[in-house]
Each structure stands twice: as structure tokens, then as C-alpha cells.
Amino acid sequence: MAYADSPENAIAVIKQRTALMNRCLSQHKLMESLQHTSIMLTELRNPNLSPKKYYELYVIIFDSLTNLSTYLIENHPQNHHLADLYELVQYTGNVVPRLYLMITVGTSYLTFNEAPKKEILKDMIEMCRGVQNPIRGLFLRYYLSQRTKELLPEDDPSFNSQFIMNNFIEMNKLWVRLQHQGPLRERETRTRERKELQILVGSQLVRLSQIIDDNFQMYKQDILPTILEQVIQCRDLVSQEYLLDVICQVFADEFHLKTLDTLLQTTLHLNPDVSINKIVLTLVDRLNDYVTRQLEDDPNATSTNAYLDMDVFGTFWDYLTVLNHERPDLSLQQFIPLVESVIVLSLKWYPNNFDNLNKLFELVLQKTKDYGQKNISLESEHLFLVLLSFQNSKLQLTSSTTAPPNSPVTSKKHFIFQLISQCQAYKNILALQSISLQKKVVNEIIDILMDREVEEMADNDSESKLHPPGHSAYLVIEDKLQVQRLLSICEPLIISRSGPPANVASSDTNVDEVFFNRHDEEESWILDPIQEKLAHLIHWIMNTTSRKQTMKNKIQFSLEAQLEILLLIKSSFIKGGINVKYTFPAIITNFWKLMRKCRMIQEYLLKKRPDNKTLLSHYSNLLKQMFKFVSRCINDIFNSCNNSCTDLILKLNLQCAILADQLQLNEISYDFFSQAFTIFEESLSDSKTQLQALIYIAQSLQKTRSLYKEAYYDSLIVRCTLHGSKLLKKQDQCRAVYLCSHLWWATEISNIGEEEGITDNFYRDGKRVLECLQRSLRVADSIMDNEQSCELMVEILNRCLYYFIHGDESETHISIKYINGLIELIKTNLKSLKLEDNSASMITNSISDLHITGENNVKASSNADDGSVITDKESNVAIGSDGTYIQLNTLNGSSTLIRGVVATASGSKLLHQLKYIPIHHFRRTCEYIESQREVDDRFKVIYV
């Protein structure tokens, strides 16, 4: 009988013959129905069908044969006897239809108790040898397996397992044989088809695992050796990978645990191209799942379950050692994932044993050296990145309610830190990698260590009292050695640069070009995320050393211990060269914290142990020593960065001076202020920068209190004022001098308990205040530009009003006569501005030209008698304390600097249009004076 020429026609034939078969069965015409069935089964003889199409036909035929089997069972033995039919169907002409009919009739007969089950089963499986075509034979044996699934003898598991084993062995042979049929050019196609058929073979192992259930002795003595022998003997890549994976998946975890050595030894005899790491990883996953289930059922399972006491790691370690010895050809791409899978197992079974990890990393280290560092490909680099950063290790925070009591490694953060502290081989492997790879790994390590999520979870748990006694999710650094090892890991980032370094060694490099490139690098100040992260790391290290609890005991780091750690950090980060401008401020900040802590200890000792002079002297000397360390850090920044960080160095000196003053160390404070003035004199050249620096120095000096002794304060404020009077631009001189007037008029600092009207020892000298204001007024009056002169005079007037409000005339020497005279002088200058424009309307037009339209226009008019200027609308142009012009946007609250335009357009139209600024400023001041008359009678004699 011929078969259809296409799958579609074959399906049509099968459906037609199925309908005819069902009709004959309904009419009890069994022989005719068997004839239709035989014709239908002929379609399974088609050699041109792909596995996918063959499966489609098989499914339809299976349903049809199920109907036939149901009829046979229901009509036995009334209309026929199945034993006779079993003999009858063996006369079918073609072997494929014959065997399908035999299996259908035979399995139908097996449903009855009188049937000789074992003989029929043996006969059917033996007859299946008649089909040696791989695809036909596989589906035929799969059909036998499906039909006999529930019909095997219940009282003889040995026979059942042997039956399935025989079927599996033959199916595997057919499956492997498929690879060697056809021309070589179709090899990839056949491999793809084989993978489509692999589930048929794997189903036999699934069925086998169901039959043996928990019978370990049968599995160990009969099943596993036979299966592994077949796997090894077939020498087929696809078969070996798939079957070992199925073995690991379908049989019980306890079986794998007890036969672990046998399974691992089998992988040593596989085809060299087999991906061993995939098989081992599957096995590891099963073993880890077993541990997870045991710990979930019983947190104390490590002491009660004998399986968990087995040396599982030792078995894997011996296996890796033998594998590395017998397979020196194994590439890094194959070896590293294999080691990584064992690391995963070790982390699950032995979370506290870092010696195991050190062994594994030593093995990888040796393999890397044997392989040759120059031979490491980009793919291998990625594998090292995954290995060293533990991306595949699934390290997650262990819940405090399910964690074993002997496991302090509660998070990936804890694990990484302990790894760095205890595994020297890990650091050695990292050191062998390229600089770029080292940076990536260290970057990820720092991200893990500084992850806030774990600590936030710990905070929440501690509030709800979820943590058991002695358990903490916080990471605590216990000694200086741990810090040293952590910093040694971070060295690639510490010494890294934002851009490529100049190639000084190149013979083609121009010396001048190298010099200027280095100069540009030093002068640049670009935000570097890596260095910013390192600065965060410094704070993280110091915070972790100051925590009070670890998982084992309570520990309070002494001040000296923290100081040693901070000095260790400094000695490591000094290697960064120009990068210290990013990291040293964090170190200095932590020095400041330790200084305050030292002062708190001193105050405690003075209160509790005032007679212990030795201890008090020790902490006093320690405090002074820390200021020396800070001074050294600041000098290191200057030496490494030259003039590119003068602003930072100036501010650090001033902050140290303020802190020393707060700690009543007036000599140290004076030294830091002197150093700040030295930086100002030697390193600052830009006029605006000098003005800003002087303002910052004046602000810092004004807050000091301990410098009053020994005339330190007088010396410094006079020096500050003199520098202000020597600035390049007169407007800067004027502003600097009138701002320095505050240095002779101290104000309250509420944080130290001072209060105006109660504290009577404020440093105040009204005569010097008046001298500063008079000097600044003379400078303002000498400026040739009337607009700037008027603006500065208005600013000086505001300062005079400040002193007039906050002090008596006898103290400040700012008299009403002086204020009235200053107001008259301002009015006179404003008249000059009006005369320059010929009319006040021109000022209004100038404001309109600045695109300040509509409701923001300033409508100005001039009073010819007193020179005052009145405006009825608010302007949206203002001037800063340093002379910066700012145009305000009243709609969205934003502002735009126009200082640069003004600075480059002297005498231009735009500068001419800004004349309304001093006018408006003076108007606001006059309005303030008028408003103060209601609350202060002294303002009534000030004429505006």
C-alpha cells in the first residue's frame, strides 16, 4: 500500500479511514475496521516526513487507535477474544501497521487479569526491534510506552523498570543513529530534528523515576549504572548533554546526594565537546533546592539531617581537581562557569566557609596563569566579570525569620565584605585582569557595599523586633586589616583618571604638548562619578567602624582606632594624585567629626574624672595632632593639584579655623586663618574671585570667639580689611571694606548661648565701623561712573541703617546727621543721572528697552526740588552683593545673569539702560525708612 504524497493528503486519508473504521466498529465489522486501520497506519511509513509533521500524524492516529482499543476492551470476549486477535494482527502485511496493531490489541488484552502480562510485554518490546528507521522506531516505542503506562504489573517493580530500561536503551540508539543518516551538509538539520525528538527519549527516564519512586537501592544498583553506561557508550554530544540533564532533573534529590561522586565521575568520560558546566549547574541547582526545602522545614536541619552533614563541597573539589588534571585542554570559557556553579553550591551549603571559596579562586588563578594572561579573550573577560562580581550567584538578603542560626552572612553586602577580608586568591585573580575589568568589578563591589536597601530593611526589622538576639543586618568593620584589604581592592579606581593619560614615553610625543595637556588636566574640574563614589566609600567605612553592634558581640571603636583607620584611608587615597581633590575633602570631613568626638570625650572626663590629668592631656594632644593631619591633607591637595583647587583649599582652611575656634584652640585657628590669607595672596588673581574669597574670610572671622585673646582677632580683621582696600576694582574695594565693617561689630550666635541685650562681651568698636564706612564712601564717590557710584552709596546707606538700628549712636558712631548727609549726597548723584538723560522719561524708556514690558515697567518722575525719584511699579532687575546684575522672571521665579554682558559693554547702550537700578534701590530704601517711623521715633528725623 502506498502512502500520501504530502502531509495534508496524509491527514485527509487518516481522517477518512478513521471515519470508516468507526462506522465498521459501530456495525461490529471488526475485520473491515482493522483493514481501514492498517491503511491509516500506512501513512506512518512515509520517509519524507519531518519529526514535526510525523508527530502531527501520530497524534491523530493515537486518538483513532484509542477508539479501537476501547471497542476491543468492551467486546471481549463476547464478540472476539483478544488473544486470538493478538495472533491475527501479526499477519498484517507491512511491519509498521502490524506493530501498531499488535501494541493496540496487546495493551487492550493487558487490561484483563487472565492475560499473561509479562509474556505479552516481552513479546511487544521484542517485536519493536523490527523497525530500525530512527523516526518510525522512536514513535513506535513511544506509543508502546504510552499504552503500557498504567498496565505494568504492580507486584514486580524490577520487571517494570527493566522493561522501561530496555525501551529507553533502544530509543536512545535510534535517536543517536538519526545523526549519522543522510549527507554531511544536512548535519545541522538533523541535529535540529534530533532536538525536536529528544522529549520522546527523556519521557522514558521520567517514567522510570515514577516507577522506582523512593527505592534507592534499585536506583543505585540497577538503574543508574545502566543509564550512565549507555550515556558514555553513545559518545554523542546531543545525547550526553540531554540525558544527563534529564537524569539530574527527574530523579530525587536524595538520590543525587548519595550518588554524587558517580555522577561527577561520569562527566569525566563524556565527549570532549560536551558542556560539562551546564550539567554540573543543573545538579547544583537540585542540591541547593534540597537544602532550601530542608531549612524551610526545619531551621536546625544542619544538626538533624545526616545528608546535610555530608562533605558535598569536598566531593566537588576532588572532582574539579581531577578534571583540571585530566582535561588541561578545557578552556576558560568552559572552566570558569564550572567553578562558578560550585561557588553557588558552597554559598548555599556552607555560607560561613570562605576557605572553600578561597580554594576555588586559587584553582581559577592557577588555570588563568596556565592559560596565559595574554590569551584571555573578550568573552573570557566577561566571564571573569560575572565570576568576580557574583552576578549569577543569586546572593540575596536572607530573611531573619528563616536564616539558620549559624549563618551571619545575611546579605550580599556582608558576603562581599567577608570575601574581600578573607579570600586572598580572589584579590590575586582580580589583580591579573585588565585595568578596565578591575574597575568594573570594583565599581560593582562598592555599589553592593554601599547599598542602602539592606540597612533600611534592617532598620524596619529592628523597629518591629524581627531580628533575633545577636543578629544584625548591619555590616561592621572590626579591625584595621579589613579596611586595608578593602582599600587594596579599590586601588584601580583610586588611581584612575577621567581621561587618557599623556603618552610621555612615546618618541613622537612633543614635550610642550605633553606639558600643556597635563596643565589642562590639572586645571580641569570635571565631575567624576567614580571619584564621587570613592568619597562616599570613605564616609561608609568610617560609619561602619563606629557602629556599636556586630552579629557576635558588642564593640565600640575607640577614638584612636578610628583615627588609625582614617590615616590608613588617607595613605591609600594619596596614590590617586590629582584625584585627591575629589576624595580628600571627605577624609578631612571625617577628621572634623573625630575632633568633635575628641572634645566630647574631654568634656566628659572633665565632668567625671577631673583629676586624671594624664588622660586629659592625652586627648588634648590628640586633638592638636588631628589638626596637623588635616593641615597635611590640605597641603597634599595643593601639591597634587597646584592652582586648580585654590578655592577648595581656601575654604577648607577657613572651615578648620572655625572648628578650632569652636574648640577654643585659638592658636590653631589663627594658623589656619593665616594659611587662608597666604592662599589669597599667592594663588588668587581674579578680581571677582578675590572679592568672594574676602567675603568668605570675613564671614568666617565674624563667627569666631576664641581669637579675641592675644590680639589674634585684631590682627586678622585688619589684614582682611587691608586686602579689601587693595582690590583691583574700586567697586570691589568699596564693597569689601563696608562688608569688613561687620568684623568690628559682633552679633549673637544662638548656638553657643549668646543673646543680644544679655551677653555683654561682644567685640564691638563703633569708631572702626565708621572708619570702614567712611573709607568705602570715599572710594564710591571717587568712581567716575555715576551709576556704579550711586549704587554703592545706596548700599553703604543700607549698612549705615543696619548699624543705626542695632546699636546706639554712642556705640556705633553712626549719627542721624551722617545718615542725612549721605542721603543728600545720593540725591545729588541721582540728579546727575537725570541730567545725563535730560529727563526722567528717558530712564523709563531705557527700562522698556530691556524687554521688561507691561506691568513691570518702572514709571519714574523726578522732583526738581529734592532730587528724589518716585517709581510706582516693581522692577525685575536686581544687583547682587558682588555687583552682579540679575534679570528676574516674575512668572516662573527664575533669574538670568546679565553680568557678563554688562562687563563687556562698558559705555554701550545696554550699560546705559541700567541706570534705573540705583534709582529703584534708593526708592526701596526710602520706603523702608518711612515704614520704620511708625515703630522707631529716631527715623522721624531722617529726611528722605
UniProtKB/Swiss-Prot annotation:
Ranges annotated as spanning the membrane: none
A biological process term (GO) from this entry: negative regulation of endoplasmic reticulum unfolded protein response
Keywords per UniProt: Membrane, Phosphoprotein, Protein transport, Transport
First-listed, main subcellular location of the protein, grouped into a coarse class: membrane
Modified residues (Phosphoserine): 846, 848, 868
One Pfam family, short name: Vps35
Subcellular location: Membrane
GO cellular component, one term: fungal-type vacuole membrane
Membrane topology: Peripheral membrane protein
Function noted in UniProt: Plays a role in vesicular protein sorting. Required for the endosome-to-Golgi retrieval of the vacuolar protein sorting receptor VPS10. Vacuolar carboxypeptidase Y (CPY) sorting is completely dependent on the presence of functional VPS35. The latter may play a role in the function, modification or packaging of a CPY-specific receptor complex. Component of the membrane-associated retromer complex which is essential in endosome-to-Golgi retrograde transport. The VPS29-VPS26-VPS35 subcomplex may be involved in cargo selection.
PANTHER family: VACUOLAR PROTEIN SORTING-ASSOCIATED PROTEIN 35, VACUOLAR SORTING PROTEIN 35
Note: Present with 2360 molecules/cell in log phase SD medium.
Subunit structure: Component of the retromer complex which consists of VPS29, VPS26, VPS35, VPS5 and VPS17. Component of a retromer subcomplex consisting of VPS29, VPS26 and VPS35.
Family: Belongs to the VPS35 family.
This protein's name: Vacuolar protein sorting-associated protein 35
Native organism: Saccharomyces cerevisiae (strain ATCC 204508 / S288c) (Baker's yeast)
